[in-house]
Amino acid sequence: MKTLSLFLVLVCLLGLVQSWEWPWNRKPTKYPIPSPNPRDKWCRLNLGPAWGGRC
């Protein structure tokens, strides 16, 4: 049981690392990107209006 939970945690961490870009791998943009709206983030996660995902 312990090994299974550890495996699940490892899989989750690997998924996060895969989706996260290293800052030095990003191509520099000419225009500064505005800070993302937290509501926009929930909107992208498709959690619906109840979670502040009003698009």
Curated annotation (Swiss-Prot):
One of its GO terms (cellular component) is extracellular region. It comes from the Eukaryota. GO terms for molecular function: hormone activity. Pfam families: Sex_peptide (PF08138). The keyword Disulfide bond applies. InterPro entries: Sex_peptide. GO terms for biological process: regulation of female receptivity, post-mating. It is found in: Secreted. This is Accessory gland-specific peptide 70A. It comes from Drosophila simulans (Fruit fly).
